[in-house]
Amino acid sequence: MRGTEHLELCRLIALLFLSFLLNGFAYSQRYPNHEVNKLLDVGIEYVLNQNYELARLKFRLLDKKYPQLPFGKIYLAVVDITKAFDYGEEIKSEAISESLDEALELSEKLLKNNPIDIWNHYFVALSKGYKSYLKVLNDEWISAISSGLSSVNYFEDCLEMDSTFYESYVALGTYKFWKSRKLEFLEWLPFFDDESEKGIEYLELALAKTSYNRNLAVVSLIWIYIESKNFYRAIAIAENELKKNPINRTLKWALARAYEDVDLRKAIQIYDDLLNSYKSIPDQNHFQEITLKHIIAQQYVKIGEKREALRLCDEILTDNRLTEVVRDKLSDRIKRVRKMNKELIE
């Protein structure tokens, strides 16, 4: 994959992996409390449809009514991370870490008091998984994988207690694949075990065996198939899922990327839809607009439509709405846009 885009996809994959883990108990394994399930179902639906403020209200209510459970604190972290990533905003790592520390403390207390309850193992796994993810946000991949091992162990505990706890397959499958890909430079070592294929097997199993969870685990599979250059499988999964969540930007972005290696004009069309979606967001920082315009310009160059690519470069370079913080985050991309612009006019 291409430099910066590769890094962005890796970060997105990590986000999808860890945020999707939190929805794993639905339908196949539901927490034994109707009101808790209802609040979670509604809040999760708001997240999937990018209604972040409404989702936050539901999870705050959940945390207020059930302070002894870590669900509310974990899901409030999910909302903050997902919204920040979707909008291209800075992630408030310190506040999120504090919330997850509280969730982990609750989870470990529950586990200590009742170690035979599978949910208590699951709570610890989720809390530790998200703490590991904060390292991913800072591109600390080795450290993230190392600390993530503890989370993985708890997911494995869930499977030992109940082999039909398919949500653990989602977590373990995603972990096994990306651990293998991120550490493949260590493959010469005797202890290195490439489990990427096993990871795909686990995810396909979860896809076939779960209901609500398949709408979540599927995105991890899409990016894995893109990474594995199995673009048609990625497209098939994404298009099927978009029938259920047609406005979901995460799915659209994955689908567009898959089409880049199959049908560039189709990819441009989907990226344009995404661009229009971001333009409609009030009071946004325009980070994703700039990112998408650059990506679309790159696709136009590939198909020889240099005039359209130049138009987009000009729009990026003359955009005066960006704050200093956003411009700094986009500095590398803007340099590449300037280079592209120069090459197009020569």
Question: Language model features by range: what are they?
Answer:
Residues 31-38, 46-59, 76-164, 169-212, ...:
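Short coil/linker segments at helix-helix boundaries
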Residues 82-92, 133-134, 179-185, 264-269, ...:
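Alpha-helical linker/edge segments of TPR/alpha-solenoid repeat scaffolds
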Residues 213-227, 253-267, 272-284:
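Alpha-helical adaptor scaffolds
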Residues 69, 117, 165, 213-214, ...:
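Residue-level recognition of tetratricopeptide repeat
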Residues 13-23:
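Bacterial N-terminal signal peptides
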Residues 152, 191-200, 272-276, 306-322:
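TPR/TPR-like (Sel1-like) alpha-helical repeat modules
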